[in-house]
Amino acid sequence: QVWYDREVTAFVEPG
């Protein structure tokens, strides 16, 4: 599952 990071404005994988 991915989450939307508004700070970078891109979909990233939390890790």
Swiss-Prot record:
Protein name: Unknown protein from spot 308 of 2D-PAGE of etiolated coleoptile
Lineage: Eukaryota, Viridiplantae, Streptophyta, Embryophyta, Tracheophyta
Other facts noted in the record for this chain: On the 2D-gel the determined pI of this unknown protein is: 5.9, its MW is: 18.6 kDa.
